[in-house]
Amino acid sequence: MKGEPMTATRSQRRDCPDVSPICEVFKMLRRLMLWVGVLAGTAGSLATAQGLTPNASLAKMQLPEGLRADLLASEPWVRQPVAIDWDDRGRLWVLQYLQYPNPEGLRRIEVDRYSRTRYDRMPAPPPHGPRGSDRLTILHDDDGDGRIDRGHDFLDGLNLASGFAFGHGGVFVLNIPYLLFYPDRDRNDLPDSDPKVLLTGFGMQDAHSVANSLMFGPDGWLYGCQGSTVTSNIRGIEFQQGVWRYHPATDRFELFCEGGGNSWGLDFDAQGHLLYSTNYGGHLLLHGVQGGYYVKSFAKHGNLHNPYAFGYFDHAPHTNFTGGHVTVGGMVYQGDLLPESFRGKYIAADLLGHAAYWHQIQPLGSTFATRHGGNLLQSNDPWFAPSDLTIGPDGAITIADWHDARTAHPDPDASWDRSNGRIFRITTWQSPPRAAPFDLSLLTDMQLMDEILHPVSANAWKKRRSRQELVRRYGSLAGEKIEQTESFNALIERCRDAALRSDEPSGALEALWTWISLRHGRA
């Protein structure tokens, strides 16, 4: 579907006078037709967004000189996007959070003043629990013009699904209260089986604070954020907000650090420092260190869970705070498409300010301070609500737009416009419409190592995905136990040699991280 979705702006509608009882009947019928089409998820739904059309919303965006934004995808292929990422074949995946804010099939027992909800039971994991509306969709640009032509679901029927990550021959999915693994070892874009339940006990009291932002760290662990107004209890470890991690090959779970805020977004810089976002007013991010404890709104969220933590760290000091107080999808730009001045800058979306900003990260002793740098994208569309952003294979920045007049849910029974959502791509005016087709699985082990150790390439996406492809080939979740074969030994030897002999510190780090990931990735 290449043209604009069929929709109407406010000025184009022809509503009847509200005083007419007959009109009220027609309005109710029209609303019913809208929701029937939306809930069915059909591409041919005639009534869609209440706000601006995708192209009209695009026209409301302002970017720095030399940069441009293009519409990559919109309804009907994308609705309520909460997480996006590019796979090893250069295809964009989107997690559609259509069940938000109430889980399917559960009964509310109690809702407190902070919107924390107690339900009648814990649902069984998919496919045995209540079938929700969330879906994980693969988007396809068949003709290479930079616009999505079609989409198909890798998964549907999910119920409060808030994050996903590729790795180990499949897809990891947060379907609260579970962390699931869906194998797809034949790479046919269909799960090989029902999911394996890896972790149980993520809090589900508040759908806008649940666990989120899955991504693999350079050490081979799978990391995720935890929001503020939910309480998780994983294998006897209870916590509210913070960062947790899971090691797929050894089945270990750890609370990496506790505290911060309602965090939706984390990343690692070129040296491996973990930075995660916050909704704490006046601040941008936290520098997460293993075993660290950070400030919380203690009256609202409770004390730190370690009784021997007699103090805590604060957020990174921030200068020239701008916009709303909710930072989402924060990442360190480590691409080679945007101008060099953006490299190493922290780029994050401002959910309430309808914008995305870039910020300077400055060393401050053993940690960092941040300073607002400027706008990456500012929208004058009040429905533009950036919910996630990521770097693509070509170094472009991809931004998901939740696209709604509001995002919070103080009233759990309020109606929501689930008919729309957009994804935009930020590039330069000289950039091609899309990355050239590729498939990392077709590269040899040594070609993947070339990508990881490339001294010139500044695209962290290629390095990270190449490392994950090697782990897929030799990790314990990729099939039978891998013995020390000649090819595996050759990889380890190259990692060791690069770590010891590299003239570039970044090359030595990349080699060390790959060595650790491969060694821990084996059963």
Residue ranges of each PLM-predicted region?
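Bacterial N-terminal signal peptides
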Residues: 29-45
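Beta-propeller blade termini and top-face loops
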Residues: 50-437, 442-450, 458-463, 467-523
